[in-house]
């Protein structure tokens, strides 16, 4: 008999009562070649014929079961065929369909092409929708008294199948992919869910109801199945948070709030820190910083950071999603924990001469971070604790105003001063001078600057003083009465700007790019003439050699006058000419044309009225002394000494003593390096405080590698980083360079053999790397890791626990750098450092994917794989990643380094040589998954080649559906296909 179509063949088999295997043999004879059974829709044809009557045809059903068992038909076509049956009133038919699902629903798999695997995802979602509709139909039936028992039985069967299907993570993962692939079909599932929930309302059977509720909640969890994370509850100390806060308070008070908030949130997410403990750690770091800060400016900086900046940081943190938790409750809880640390609070109170906790609580309450009731409760508890410490009561000096109170008062004053500075200076220069004079008295200036820095107003503060400094150039209608006022306005603004640049970094002063003819005088002078740490000045630079006629008239003025005249003097020109004038005077002195008495008169003239002249003169002398031999320095140093000694007479201008204090501090900063190099002592007038804190911390005769090792060992023993250590690490990073610093710290990490020590080391190293996260990450991922992974003689160093710890550190650094890099957040401190040039990375990782990269040639240990990878005709598909589909720029060093690191990881996974380096790769990927932010398709995993997914699932610990979902970019159609193929094969 010639069979025309499938339906005829099935009917013939039924008529002749073929057995199932006989049917299969004959079918293959009827349809020998060509299309597969799925394309012929065999499963649907069999079901259609089997379900014609009120009860199913057992013989045709046996053919379908045989086809499923012998894999003639795929699971997806069977599920699709089942989901097309919608006459739920035929109970026996529904039962037999459920039995067919039982055959394979808990062990679904597909080893075909990616398209077939996506087909399985879609079919599974259709089957889920069918089961929901089925359950809803019987839930309605149960309410009819006549058919209640039968309907309950049917509904129970449906719910059991739903439970069985959904209890498998693999099935839920496949549905998750389908939901992203076909949103319209998922909408249909949601509609069926709503219908089932409505039908359950009148259901009296509690067992069925709870069973249905369980299924519903499982289905609702499918779209968010990646975002459920547990918090760490076994730890109470988090040294990374502590160190990040300390680093920011010590070195970056002027930094913007947002990058700090993002960095803290990144640490919180990566380390899974519960919110109350996270905030407790922030407060602990603030109090430790306050207690250990050196007296003077640093103490004021820390006070401003704690009482002004950190409450603002918490306000920003409040804006992040916190689930169903109340943020103010977490803040309250953190303060409750903090109250238990009585010794810490007592020490802070003693240092600050006030009840710090009370002031902090008021500030947080003002910002809406604490309720009134909680604030009162916490304040009362702290008050009671303080009564038990009599030394706090007696130690408090009623005459000394505590810094926290002064800082909180200074903050509104900053705003008022900024308004005053906006006024027209020409109308009332005397009034403005009065305000500035008041600012100079005592520690007012440092208080105001600290408050401005902590509230992000320092840049505009500096800009106002630059504008004032520029205003003093106008001298057209000047008389002897207005000349001293203009001289003082110039001098005070100049000194203040120098002081700001030295205390908070010159980047605070620098404005955004301007045309060359509009750059203010002070900015030009600071960039070209002002000595700073690590800046080498050329004393013969054109900036020190102005118009010779101006220099001659200035020399004559200084030498011949009994005192400096003020009327019609252009102070900007004087400051630029003074360096050349000093050179003339110095030459005359060295050639005995001038006597020491004449030099004294000249230096008195320089420093007697306008201190800025002395600052500019010393700036040039410092550059000059560096260039001289040991025996030639004496007279230059003597001149510095003369200029640094204040003039005590009646004939000085207003506010002279206040200006001298700032001048001395500026000169001490300028001369620090050169005095150390020449072993010279110059006594600067004492301002009653340590003017250069954290300066010159490195021991003079100890190799820097030993210093690095010993400081890191101490920090590791203590378990936290202190401010002094942060500054030492910063100096070592400057001195040794990024590669040296990173390489030696990684070596220290790999020496650790105890698990708890390695974890602590990672937490601390991550914080230390925050000194320059971008550059250290490039070095770690671009140089150090590839060297360790490609050199078989170093593989033993990657064993657990140090290898696992290094994997963790690498992922943390990669995630942080990538996140902040994409937001363009680099602190001013980091921007100042030498940037790695893109060329450094082009040579290591060529842009053109067809050229063999140096990194790939390093893979000497796996000959075949290395050859394939680096061969000129290597196909793009082996390295195609989501980042290329997202068109991420590979001109960027970080993107390039990440892409190549993942290529290397991919080649190690596919290699025939296994070892600790393979294990390292596994730890690296596990950590990536652990730290992943839900929905972050722009994460570092986008650089992973798609081909790597199938290699990864072969590793036992990575062969879970959730991990596959986490590591693939499900926002891309190709990403979904890769994920479906990998999960369906598990």
UniProtKB/Swiss-Prot annotation:
UniProt motif (LXXLL motif 6) ranges: 855-859
Motif segment (LXXLL motif 3): 445-449
Sequence motif LXXLL motif 5, location on chain: 785-789
GO molecular function, one term: nuclear thyroid hormone receptor binding
Keyword annotations from UniProtKB, A to Z: Activator, Nucleus, Repeat, Transcription, Transcription regulation
Segments forming a coiled coil: none
Record keyword Transcription regulation present: yes
GO biological process: positive regulation of DNA-templated transcription; positive regulation of transcription initiation by RNA polymerase II
Alphabetized InterPro entries for the sequence: Mediator_Med24
Residue ranges of the motif LXXLL motif 1: 128-132
Residue numbers covered by motif LXXLL motif 2: 341-345
Compartment(s) of residence: Nucleus
GO CC aspect terms: mediator complex; nucleus
Motif LXXLL motif 4 per UniProt: ranges: 554-558
Function noted in UniProt: Component of the Mediator complex, a coactivator involved in the regulated transcription of nearly all RNA polymerase II-dependent genes. Mediator functions as a bridge to convey information from gene-specific regulatory proteins to the basal RNA polymerase II transcription machinery. Mediator is recruited to promoters by direct interactions with regulatory proteins and serves as a scaffold for the assembly of a functional preinitiation complex with RNA polymerase II and the general transcription factors.
Assembly notes: Component of the Mediator complex.
PANTHER family: MEDIATOR OF RNA POLYMERASE II TRANSCRIPTION SUBUNIT 24 (PTHR12898:SF1)
Family: Belongs to the Mediator complex subunit 24 family.
Protein known as: Mediator of RNA polymerase II transcription subunit 24
Biological source species: Gallus gallus (Chicken)
């Amino acid at each position: 008999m010639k069979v025309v179509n499938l339906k005829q063949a099935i009917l013939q088999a039924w008529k002749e009562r073929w057995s199932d295997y006989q049917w299969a043999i004959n079918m293959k004879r009827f349809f020998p070649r060509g299309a597969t059974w799925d394309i012929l829709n065999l499963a649907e044809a069999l079901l259609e014929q089997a379900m014609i009557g009120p009860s199913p045809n057992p013989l045709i059903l046996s053919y379908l079961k045989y086809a499923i068992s012998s894999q003639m038909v795929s699971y997806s076509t069977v599920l699709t065929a089942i989901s097309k049956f919608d006459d739920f009133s035929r109970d026996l038919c529904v039962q037999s369909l459920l039995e067919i699902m039982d055959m394979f629903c808990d062990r679904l798999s597909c080893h075909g092409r990616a398209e077939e695997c996506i087909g399985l995802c879609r079919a599974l979602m259709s089957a889920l929708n069918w089961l929901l509709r089925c359950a809803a139909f019987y839930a309605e039936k149960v309410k009819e008294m006549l058919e209640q028992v039968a309907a309950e039985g049917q509904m129970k069967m449906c719910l059991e199948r739903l439970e069985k299907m959904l209890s498998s993570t693999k099935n839920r993962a496949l549905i998750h992919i389908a939901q992203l692939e076909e949103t319209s079909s998922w909408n249909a599932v949601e509609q069926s869910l709503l219908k089932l929930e409505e039908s359950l309302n009148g259901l009296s059977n509690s067992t069925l109801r709870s069973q249905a509720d369980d299924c519903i909640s499982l289905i609702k969890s499918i779209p968010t199945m990646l975002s459920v994370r547990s918090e760490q509850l076994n730890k109470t100390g988090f040294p990374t948070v502590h160190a990040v806060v300390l680093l920011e308070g010590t070195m970056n008070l002027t930094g913007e709030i947002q990058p700090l908030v993002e960095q803290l949130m990144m640490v919180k997410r990566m380390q899974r820190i519960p919110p109350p403990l996270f905030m407790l750690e922030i407060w602990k770091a603030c109090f430790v910083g306050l207690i250990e800060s050196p007296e003077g400016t640093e103490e004021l900086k820390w006070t401003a950071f704690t009482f002004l900046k950190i409450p603002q940081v918490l306000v920003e943190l409040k804006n992040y999603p916190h689930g169903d938790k109340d943020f103010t409750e977490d803040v309250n809880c953190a303060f409750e924990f903090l109250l238990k640390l009585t010794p810490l609070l007592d020490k802070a109170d003693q240092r600050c001469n006030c009840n710090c906790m009370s002031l902090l609580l008021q500030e947080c309450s003002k910002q809406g971070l604490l309720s009134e009731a909680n604030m009162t409760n916490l304040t009362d508890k702290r008050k009671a604790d303080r009564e038990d410490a009599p030394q706090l009561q007696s130690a408090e000096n009623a005459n000394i105003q505590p810094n926290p109170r002064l800082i909180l008062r200074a903050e509104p004053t900053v705003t008022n001063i900024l308004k005053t500075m906006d006024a027209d200076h020409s109308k009332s220069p005397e009034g403005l001078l009065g305000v500035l004079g008041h600012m100079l008295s005592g520690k007012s200036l440092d208080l105001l600057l600290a408050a401005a820095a902590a509230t992000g107003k320092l840049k505009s503060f500096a800009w106002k003083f630059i504008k004032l400094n520029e205003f003093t150039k106008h001298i057209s209608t000047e008389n002897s009465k207005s000349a001293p006022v203009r001289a003082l306005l110039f001098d005070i603004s100049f000194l203040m700007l120098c002081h700001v640049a030295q205390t908070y970094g010159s980047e605070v002063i620098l404005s955004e790019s301007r045309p060359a003819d509009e750059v203010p005088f002070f900015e030009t002078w600071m960039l070209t003439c002002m000595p700073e740490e690590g800046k080498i000045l050329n004393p013969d630079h054109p900036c020190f050699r102005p118009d010779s006629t101006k220099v001659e008239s200035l020399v004559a003025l200084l030498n011949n006058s009994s005192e400096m005249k003020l009327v019609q003097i252009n102070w900007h020109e004087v400051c630029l000419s003074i360096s050349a004038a000093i050179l003339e005077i110095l030459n005359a002195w060295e050639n005995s044309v001038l006597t020491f008495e004449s030099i004294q008169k000249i230096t008195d003239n320089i420093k007697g009225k306008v201190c800025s002249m002395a600052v500019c003169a010393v700036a040039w002398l410092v550059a000059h002394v560096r260039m001289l031999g040991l025996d030639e320095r004496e007279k230059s140093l003597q001149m510095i000494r003369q200029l640094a000694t204040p003039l005590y007479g009646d004939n000085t201008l207003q506010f002279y003593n206040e200006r001298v204090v700032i001048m001395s501090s500026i000169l001490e900063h300028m001369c620090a390096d050169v005095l150390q190099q020449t072993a010279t002592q110059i006594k600067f007038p004492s301002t009653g405080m340590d003017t250069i804190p954290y300066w010159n911390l490195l021991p003079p005769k100890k190799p820097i590698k030993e210093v690095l090792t010993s400081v890191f060992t101490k920090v590791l023993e203590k378990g936290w980083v202190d401010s002094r250590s942060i500054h030492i690490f910063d100096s070592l990073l400057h001195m040794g360079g990024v590669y040296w610093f990173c390489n030696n710290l990684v070596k220290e990490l790999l020496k650790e053999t105890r698990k708890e020590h390695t974890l602590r080391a990672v937490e601390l190293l991550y914080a230390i790397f925050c000194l320059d996260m971008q550059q250290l990450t490039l070095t770690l991922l671009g140089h150090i890791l590839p060297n360790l992974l490609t050199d078989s003689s170093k593989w033993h160093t990657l064993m657990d626990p140090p290898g696992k710890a290094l994997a963790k550190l690498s992922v943390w650094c990669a995630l942080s750098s990538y996140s902040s890099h994409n937001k363009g957040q680099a602190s001013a401190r980091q921007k100042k450092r030498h940037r790695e040039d893109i060329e450094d990375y082009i040579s290591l990782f060529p842009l053109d994917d067809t050229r063999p990269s140096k990194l790939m040639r390093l893979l000497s240990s796996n000959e075949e794989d290395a050859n394939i990878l680096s061969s000129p005709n290597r196909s793009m598909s082996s390295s195609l990643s989501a980042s290329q589909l997202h068109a991420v720029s590979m001109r960027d060093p970080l993107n390039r380094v990440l892409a190549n690191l993942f290529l290397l990881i991919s080649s190690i996974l596919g290699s025939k040589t296994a070892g600790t380096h393979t294990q390292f790769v596994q730890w690296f990927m596990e950590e990536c998954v652990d730290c992943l932010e839900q929905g972050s398709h722009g994460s570092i995993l986008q650089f992973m080649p798609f081909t790597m997914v199938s290699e990864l699932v072969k590793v036992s610990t990575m062969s879970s559906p959730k991990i596959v979902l986490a590591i693939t970019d499900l926002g891309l159609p190709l990403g979904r296909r890769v994920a479906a193929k990998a999960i369906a094969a598990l």
